[in-house]
């Protein structure tokens, strides 16, 4: 969690201090506990609200000097929109909107978690806390000069006033684990590539041992013995050898079939011999966003002690050009035994995933596999930065991912698969080639991956537009978004986790 912002829960009866934040709907109404907290100043506040351009729209804010009678220095009114229609993600965004109004000078903040109809449920209060922490995260580890008046330099203790503080604290415990998982994923994506290379990434993933996650790290020797020729071909041009990390959380019944998540972890992608243009190449430090998500997800599931068996697997490489680098025209043999003609060395992520998907399918026999990868620019052309591309061989899995995408705000959009696309990756020299035609590039990339899932129920999420550099929003002000952690945590919790 962000060290500079701390959240806790207190009863409504605790006196507000510092900055007071209250909620108001689009009818400009306050709840009873809010009116009581405002005391004799309530009429003054209502007049100020009515006289302003503030309409109570969701996430809107009105910042006021505290009127006489209030023992706080500042009053912030946050709009909820139609309070009765608020969904879980709406409440999370309210928390983010609150964090957005916390200034560098605010050291104590009290938020009255109440809607006009009455107190928020404990789960809603927990969502407010999560939204505050997700919005407050910043990555400034490498800045040697930090400005005290930086709007992002938050250093506040936030007290969330609720009807039942103990119940809210209990509801927040699993949510807090998910927040930590999202922030871990963001940290990994934001790290520079000279710091986070495959061996270092593997070490950081191994820190999940502290939470009870079993860790297995496959080095070059182990991957060579497994005949992971597709992954090793990508990494052979780098001074940093590749790694595959297998994480296992045993939270379900002994022997119960696990669910599995696989992440692409290209720690830096130059394109290899098919080198990329220099413009924005620095962003290719984020080409491991899928692997970052899987590590963050495993943290979340283990920290909240999810009642399910889970495999998390990440393939970690750098794609670099040197005298040992893979060439266009090379033919490699994957772990599956299928041969691949390399047409473009910049279509490397699918090669990494091919071997890791096959390994997981054969070794662990999961109920399903979901892979995440910043795989193609084509998906950004198709969907922009608001949706990840979803490809699947299983309608039920696709429908479930779509449903939790809506509920979490981490949206997906299903794209087609079919034989007419699959034939585009047939090769005259090998079993397949690693790129198809220019058209439908995200689809042919998914068709390639499907050849390595061995009939396992599978979904592929192309997160090129959502994992890094996406537009900032109410709950994320970071370049690395941590996309996918909340989505997949919800998938597990909603459909695959043993109920209490």
Curated annotation (Swiss-Prot):
<dbReference type="GO" id="GO:0030145">
    <property type="term" value="F:manganese ion binding"/>
</dbReference>
<keyword id="KW-0031">Aminopeptidase</keyword>
<feature type="active site">
    <location>
        <position position="276"/>
    </location>
</feature>
<feature type="binding site">
    <location>
        <position position="348"/>
    </location>
    <ligand>
        <name>Mn(2+) 2</name>
    </ligand>
</feature>
<feature type="binding site">
    <location>
        <position position="348"/>
    </location>
    <ligand>
        <name>Mn(2+) 1</name>
    </ligand>
</feature>
<dbReference type="Pfam" id="PF00883">
    <property type="entry name" value="Peptidase_M17"/>
</dbReference>
<feature type="binding site">
    <location>
        <position position="269"/>
    </location>
    <ligand>
        <name>Mn(2+) 2</name>
    </ligand>
</feature>
<protein>
    <recommendedName>
        <fullName>Probable cytosol aminopeptidase</fullName>
        <ecNumber>3.4.11.1</ecNumber>
        <ecNumber>3.4.11.10</ecNumber>
    </recommendedName>
</protein>
<feature type="active site">
    <location>
        <position position="350"/>
    </location>
</feature>
<dbReference type="GO" id="GO:0070006">
    <property type="term" value="F:metalloaminopeptidase activity"/>
</dbReference>
<comment type="similarity">
    <text>Belongs to the peptidase M17 family.</text>
</comment>
<keyword id="KW-0464">Manganese</keyword>
<feature type="binding site">
    <location>
        <position position="264"/>
    </location>
    <ligand>
        <name>Mn(2+) 2</name>
    </ligand>
</feature>
<dbReference type="InterPro" id="IPR011356">
    <property type="entry name" value="Leucine_aapep/pepB"/>
</dbReference>
<keyword id="KW-0378">Hydrolase</keyword>
<comment type="function">
    <text>Presumably involved in the processing and regular turnover of intracellular proteins. Catalyzes the removal of unsubstituted N-terminal amino acids from various peptides.</text>
</comment>
<dbReference type="GO" id="GO:0006508">
    <property type="term" value="P:proteolysis"/>
</dbReference>
<keyword id="KW-0963">Cytoplasm</keyword>
<keyword id="KW-0479">Metal-binding</keyword>
<dbReference type="InterPro" id="IPR023042">
    <property type="entry name" value="Peptidase_M17_leu_NH2_pept"/>
</dbReference>
<dbReference type="GO" id="GO:0005737">
    <property type="term" value="C:cytoplasm"/>
</dbReference>
<dbReference type="InterPro" id="IPR008283">
    <property type="entry name" value="Peptidase_M17_N"/>
</dbReference>
<feature type="binding site">
    <location>
        <position position="346"/>
    </location>
    <ligand>
        <name>Mn(2+) 1</name>
    </ligand>
</feature>
<feature type="binding site">
    <location>
        <position position="287"/>
    </location>
    <ligand>
        <name>Mn(2+) 2</name>
    </ligand>
</feature>
<dbReference type="InterPro" id="IPR000819">
    <property type="entry name" value="Peptidase_M17_C"/>
</dbReference>
<dbReference type="Pfam" id="PF02789">
    <property type="entry name" value="Peptidase_M17_N"/>
</dbReference>
<keyword id="KW-0645">Protease</keyword>
<dbReference type="InterPro" id="IPR043472">
    <property type="entry name" value="Macro_dom-like"/>
</dbReference>
<feature type="binding site">
    <location>
        <position position="269"/>
    </location>
    <ligand>
        <name>Mn(2+) 1</name>
    </ligand>
</feature>
